[in-house]
């Protein structure tokens, strides 16, 4: 018989797992990894002279640059690489692979975590422990990706974004929110991996077993 078990710690772990996967996915697809300084627009009119454009944003896969026309101020946003081989740097290609693998694992864990309220074990293995192990592995992939990412700052696109950019030196560029989100998400991934053990303890406690023995199909312990 299926028992729905909800505890404070298991729900918190589930929510954190979903948040981490979503944050890493959004950061990966964002163009806000490197932010270049705003460049001066050149125009024929007096009003256009000396006008600063929006900053230049460069991500691992995406780019957002301000339109340089005199009239239009819309930004151009999208992926700059039509194929994997067109990614700006070999280091960024490796970063994309490691981050993609890590994010895929996190998304799978986030999906499975929703069903842990109904199913707590498979083949006598705790789902919480298995998911915690997978989150730890995903965190290692994310760390490798984040370590390799600054090594690609010497590529031409990074130099176009900001002068004096070189490996592990952003030059005139600054780091955007996507990099910090990915870094924070990586830290939170390891926290989730450790906290999964607490979720396992909470759902297999004596109080939960007592509720099940009383014939309750819905066990809610906060």
Curated annotation (Swiss-Prot):
GO BP terms in the entry: development of primary female sexual characteristics; development of primary male sexual characteristics; positive regulation of fertilization; single fertilization
Stated consequence of mutating residue 102 to E: Causes malformations in the distal reproductive tract development in both female and male
Gene3D superfamilies: 1.20.140.150
Bilayer topology term: Multi-pass membrane protein
UniProt key word Cell division: no
Record field: transmembrane: 11-31, 97-117, 127-147, 175-195
UniProt-annotated location(s): Membrane
Keywords: Fertilization, Membrane, Transmembrane, Transmembrane helix
Tissue distribution: Expressed in the epithelium of the vas deferens (at protein level). Widely expressed. Strongly expressed in heart, spleen, liver, kidney, thymus, testis, brain, lung, intestine, vagina, ovary and uterus. Expressed in follicle cells of the ovary, epithelial cells of the oviduct, both luminal and glandular epithelial cells of the uterus, and epithelial cells of the vagina.
GO cellular component terms listed in the entry, alphabetical order: membrane
Protein family: Belongs to the LHFP family.
Protein name in the entry: LHFPL tetraspan subfamily member 2 protein
Source organism of the structure: Mus musculus (Mouse)
Gene it is expressed from: Lhfpl2
């Amino acid at each position: 018989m299926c028992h729905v078990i909800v505890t404070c710690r298991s729900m918190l772990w589930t929510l954190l797992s979903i948040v981490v996967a979503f944050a890493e996915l959004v950061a990966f697809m964002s163009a806000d990894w490197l932010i270049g300084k705003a460049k001066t627009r050149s125009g024929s009119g007096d009003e256009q002279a000396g006008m600063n454009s929006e900053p230049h944003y460069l991500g691992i896969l995406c780019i957002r640059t301000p339109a340089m026309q005199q009239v239009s101020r819309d930004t151009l946003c999208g992926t700059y690489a039509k194929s994997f081989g067109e990614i700006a740097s070999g280091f960024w290609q490796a970063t994309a692979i490691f981050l993609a693998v890590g994010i895929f694992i996190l998304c799978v864990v986030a999906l499975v975590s929703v069903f842990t309220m109904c199913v707590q074990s498979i083949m006598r293995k705790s789902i919480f422990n298995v998911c915690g192990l997978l989150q730890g592995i995903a965190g290692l992939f994310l760390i490798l990706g984040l370590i390799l990412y600054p090594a690609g700052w010497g590529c031409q696109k990074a130099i176009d974004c900001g002068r004096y950019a070189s490996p592990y030196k952003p030059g005139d560029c600054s780091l955007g929110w996507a990099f910090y989100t990915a870094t924070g998400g990586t830290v939170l991934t390891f926290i989730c991996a450790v906290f999964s053990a607490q979720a396992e303890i909470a759902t297999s406690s004596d109080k939960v077993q007592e509720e099940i023995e009383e014939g309750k199909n819905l066990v809610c312990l906060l």
